[in-house]
Every structure is written in C-alpha cells, then in structure tokens.
Amino acid sequence: MKFSELWLREWVNPAIDSDALANQITMAGLEVDGVEPVAGSFNGVVVGEVVECAQHPNADKLRVTKVNVGGERLLDIVCGAPNCRQGLKVAVATIGAILPGDFKIKAAKLRGEPSEGVLCSFSELGISDDHSGIIELPADAPLGTDIREYLKLDDNTIEISVTPNRADCLGIIGVARDVAVLNKAPLQELEMAPVTATISDTLPITVEAADACPRYLGRVVKGINVNAPTPLWMKEKLRRCGIRSIDAVVDVTNYVLLELGQPMHAFDKDRIDGGIVVRMAKEGETVVLLDGSEATLNADTLVIADHHKALGIAGIFGGEHSGVNGETQNVLLECAYFNPLSITGRARRHGLHTDASHRYERGVDPALQYKAIERATRLLLDICGGDAGPIIDVSNEATLPKRATITLRRSKLDRLIGHHIADEQVSDILRRLGCEVTEGQDEWKAVAPTWRFDMEIEEDLVEEVARVYGYNNIPDEPIQAGLIMGTHREADLSLKRVKTMLNDKGYQEVITYSFVDPKVQQLIHPGAEALLLPNPISVEMSAMRLSLWSGLLATVVYNQNRQQNRVRIFETGLRFVPDTQANLGIRQDLMLAGVICGNRYDEHWNLAKETVDFYDLKGDLEAVLDLTGKLGDIQFKAEMNPALHPGQSAAIYLKDERIGFIGVVHPELERKLDLNGRTLVFELEWNKLADRIVPQAREISRFPANRRDIAVVVAENVPAADILSECKKVGVNQVVGVNLFDVYRGKGVAEGYKSLAISLILQDTNRTLEEEEIAATVAKCVEALKERFQASLRD
C-alpha cells in the first residue's frame, strides 16, 4: 500500500521526521518498502494567471502570453501547451528558477518573441509523467504563492507491505491508529457528521445470502453533475497513493477506500431494474464487467443483481451495464460488509485483482460502513452537487462477526516476552489499541476493537503488547538451559544412518510433495481410497499420497526428460491412509522408499553397459536391513502388487508381518507414466524396523573353516532363500555361512525343476572339526532339504 505522509499527518502528527516515522512503522510490523519525494527538487515556481493568450506570429504551435505572478508587471512567456488559455491559473517558473535536473530558467527569445519564464507541466516539476499540457490550478489559487507550498509538495510517498492479518492498515486511518499508539499521540478523527436527507427516494434492497453479506447499505443521490472536475487536492492525494483520477464519482469512492479502507461502488440508478438483490450467482450466469470483459460465474460467486440480471461481482468488480458514465444523473452508493470467505479466490478465478477484492478477502471493519457512506455522500455532494436520500440499511446482526473477548494472563505475558512490563503500561497499551479492558487479579480481559479481527487468542495480545512496548526496549537476556543428558537406547537405529548408507551406495535423497495427482495415484494403487483435499493447490495436487512411489516415479520421469537416465533416489516421509480406527480417520505411516533405473554403473571405458535388475535393488535393500539386525528374519515372498511386474517382484515380510514391497514397475504402468526403460522400486514401513536388534559380541574362532559344496534339485517354485534358511537352521552350531553360487536348468534336470549349487562353511569355536562331523552335518542338511522341499542331490 502506498500513501502520502502529509495525508497520514492529517490524522496523527508525531514530532518525528520522515526517516524516524518510516523506521517506526517498520518496527511496528508494517514493513516500509520505500520512501520517495512526491516531486522533484526545484525552486522559484509560483502561481500565476494567464492574462492574455495570442497566437505566436512565427509558429503555429506556440502561443504568446502575458502572465500575472503578483508582481509589478506582467511577464511575457511563450508557451506551446495545447491547454494554455486566457484566465487559466498556472505554475510559472520565473527567471532564476531551478527545475529538476538542475535546469536554470533564463530570459530567452523563441522564434523572435521574448520569454521570461516557463509555464510548467507536472512532468517538468518531477511530479508525474503527465506532459500532455501545463498544470491547471484552481481559480482561487493566490497569485505569487510558491507552488511547493500551494500543492504541499514537501511530502513523501510511503509504500508499506501489509501482512494479511493487518487488513485494518489498508487505509490511512489504520496506519494512523498504529502511529498514534506508538507515539502516545492523539488521533485526529475527521468530522463526518451525518448527511441530512433532502429527498425521500430509496430503492428496494434484498439480501438473499445473509451469511455472505451480513450488511448492505445503499443511498440514492439524485441530480449530480458527473462531469464536475475533481478538486486538485483530491487528485493529488489519489496520485500520491498510486491511483489515477477518472471522474468525480469514481474518485470519491477511491478516496474513501484509501482513507478508511472501505471499498465502495456507485451504480447508475436509472439502469437498475426494480431494485438491488444480493444473491449467489446462477451456474453459468454471465456479466460484462467495467473493463469490457465477460465473466462466466459459478454458483459459489456472490453477485449484486437487479430483479433480472447480475450487475457485478460482489466485492470484486462492477458491471458495465450499471456503471456510471458521462450521462449519469442519479446514482446509488453501495457500501457493504462481505464475509471474506465469500470473496476469497473468486477474483483469481476470473484473472482479476482489484483494490476492493484485496481488502474484502482480508476483511474490513464491520462497523465502518455507516461512517464510509456518510463520508462519500458529503464529498459527492460538495463536488458534484445533487440531493441525497436516506440510508437504506439491510443488516443481519446474527451473521456479523462478533468482537472477541480475550483473557491475558500475567504469567503468560511474562513467560513469552521474557520481561516484566508494569500492569499500568499493559492496560494503557491495550486501551490505546482500541480494546475495552477489564483488569483482574494478574490478568486482563480485553474486548478486541471491530477493526482488529486478527485479535482472537491470548498470544495475539502478547504480540500486541510487545510490539507497542517496543521490541528494542526488551533487554537481551542470555539463554539459560540445563545440560540434561538425553537418554539413548542402544536399540535405536537412526534414520540418518540409513540415509548415509544409501548415499554411500550412490543414492540421492529427494523430497516430494505429499499432495499428488489422484489419477496417477489410481494407476499405482487401483481402487484404493485416498484423502482428497477440499482446497487443493491444483487438480494435479489434490490427493494425499498413499505411498512415496507417486512422487518418486514422477521425479524419475522429470530426470529422464532432462537426459538423466541413470537415476538412484530415495525418500523418507509419511503416507496417509484412510483408516476408521486411526485418529481423525487417517493413519500416517513413516515410509522409506527408493527407485533405481538405467545402467548399473556410470559410463566407463573398462565397464560393460549393464542395466540394473531386481537383484541390484534387493542387494542394496538387504544392506539397509542388515543395519537393523533383522535381516535373518526378513523373507521375500512372491505376492501380487498391481504396480509391480508379477514375475519380478516380492512382498517383504518381517517374520509373519508384511512391511513392504520390492520389484520392477509393471510394464503397463511404465508405459502410462512415460518411464524410459526398466525401473525398480521398493518401499518399507520404517517404524517396523527402527528398533534394531543389538548385536551380541562373540569370540572369533581360531580354528580352520571347512567348505563343502552340494547341488540339490528342487521344484521351480521353491525359493532359494528358503533353502538357504533351512541349511542355516539345521547346522546352527557349526554352519557359519551358506551361499548360493549357481543356478542350473537344462540337461540332466527335469522340466519344472532347477539345480541350486550351495556352499556350506563349517567351523567350531572350540576345536577343529573332524571329517566325520563335517560329513554328518552336511548329511543332516541334505536330509532336512529332502524332507521339507522334496529335494534330491544332483548327480
């Protein structure tokens, strides 16, 4: 928001300079983005009157004038401005004046005619970019008065960033309140006496959507001169706030908007059919806006309509049909309070952002409408003339926001600020902020002012007290904390340790959104129910993820589209699963997931290009699982997952509980997601693994190890992992290592069977094993395999 410093000082004028004022506003939480002078540096420019204006004898586009600047004689000045005319009050740079850019005015001759000064435009004085003509001053401007003094050009524009919670500061009065509070200075409330109705004309107003529009005020003003010029003082105030003057009626509503922060609108009363109806739009209803664009409305959009059609989008933009134009004689002034939720998002939907929508979305003072409509009526009558009717008030007190009553405890105040502020100061600060305060025993009950709807809870009052007291006035205190040794369980496995291992294996950690595309998620988890967001960032981010795969696979596609074909990434994060037994109906599980694709190794002259396969990912995952000490209890079982290849995937079980999946992405899913080549994924429920088994130290055997190899033939559907597990179980005291080193299918092995070559490492910690003992242990393993898997030794 941009405003004039002098306009602010009309409301409150603390005895501090511009720099101190800007710093004070920033420290109050309204960050000042810039302070700029409203005009360039110049002197010697005074008010003059064009007494004579004749055509230059030697130039078609020049005029020869005689100008009275209040001196002993008239000045001869040559001027080329098209609006120069006799009787016009102008800004005259006399001989010796210095204009912006260090341009000194001297006596000269232009096409043979003497010129003793310059009739200035706004651009020549560095006031604005308007160079279309010379400045036209009011007829009552006193001759010879310094133009800087007359136009009050020793002023600055201050631009501030207003945070969403401080919508009350989107008007001069709101900033003035804060400055008054900070300086303990009086706020000069402007006289806004009610305008007495001189006519009885009204217009029927019906509010059908009372929740969206709790208060709607209207007032008929008849017989106005819409072509009356806007006073220069008002134009200047608007300009210094970044608002262009349009016509007197629009300028008045903009002036009230900037001064009080209350948006207003003026309708051409004669174009309203029947009366005003505040209602929700009909689905697909259209309205042509003031800028000529056509908006197609949704049923959740609030509109101002007459008895037959929509006239404008409430709180956002007026309509062209009922807009004020050069022929307007009678207007209806509108001043309303709209519920912020009924306005939020509607402007963006139509590609609009107006000063009105900016304020209504954040909220305006629900008690301000009477003051604003009286102020606008008085200004309109003073400028355009006419007669005003009575105020038409349609209010629903039940739906208007209520003032919050908040209890501030001394203990909470001291604890959060870390400094004791005297009771009298606290009470004084709250009252200066506009609160109605009742003092109690070590507490205050404060009723928030109507313009501060951001005051809702105790912490809000703590913030306000600290802000007004001054953050710089709170002494620095060194932080004191007791050094309490935290407890550490040996069984706790840090997720950071797992991440470090994956980093060491060439994986990169990524963080993806918890919001995913529901269509993509349905491809990965067909038929699964997901939590849908009522107000998503976009349609593609409207569902909460059921697994980390949605984000990871999208990341793979993103990288592949940028010629990064070798990808190794992992992520840890929450998934959100609807569960009626969980708190709030949503179960949140911490997951660990990873994806690999592309070549096994980076390109190298001494390495063959080999694409990653199931066992690459399984090996990396087993290394992670080994950190938990539970690898021996992990089983990979063939189990269907719609997102994975049925022949190259497995469910991961910890004892008898499934904790995740691993496998190659299903070819059909791969095609639909535009994945380039084989992609492998895994996902685990981390909390099932975080409590690791503490390793038990044991003596390393000093005796020699013995290796024996066996080849067993088993059915094709028997997992090799089960064979190895059985061998370990049978030879628990002596078999210290079991390894599968070959798988054979073909000649000598029947169809539907496979030959597994297994090495058994046997060793004892107390003695050297005899050959008979070794043979007996191997025989026990073979016998166990025959009994459980119908295995046979291969010849």
Curated annotation (Swiss-Prot):
Keyword Magnesium recorded: yes
CC cofactor: Mg(2+)
Principal place of residence: cytoplasm
Domain tRNA-binding: 39-148
Catalytic activity: tRNA(Phe) + L-phenylalanine + ATP = L-phenylalanyl-tRNA(Phe) + AMP + diphosphate + H(+)
Domain of life the protein comes from: Bacteria
Gene Ontology terms: biological process: phenylalanyl-tRNA aminoacylation
EC code: 6.1.1.20
Domain B5: start-end pairs: 401-476
GO molecular function terms listed in the Swiss-Prot or TrEMBL record: ATP binding; magnesium ion binding; phenylalanine-tRNA ligase activity; tRNA binding
Gene3D superfamilies: 3.30.56.10, Bira Bifunctional Protein, Domain 2, Ferrodoxin-fold anticodon-binding domain, Nucleic acid-binding proteins, Phenylalanyl-trna Synthetase, Chain B, domain 3
CDD domains reported in the protein's UniProt record: PheRS_beta_core, tRNA_bind_bactPheRS
FDX-ACB domain ranges (all copies): 701-794
Cofactor descriptive note: Binds 2 magnesium ions per tetramer.
Residues binding Mg(2+): 454, 460, 463-464
Family to which this protein belongs: Belongs to the phenylalanyl-tRNA synthetase beta subunit family. Type 1 subfamily.
Record HAMAP family: Phe_tRNA_synth_beta1 (MF_00283)
Official protein name in the record: Phenylalanine--tRNA ligase beta subunit
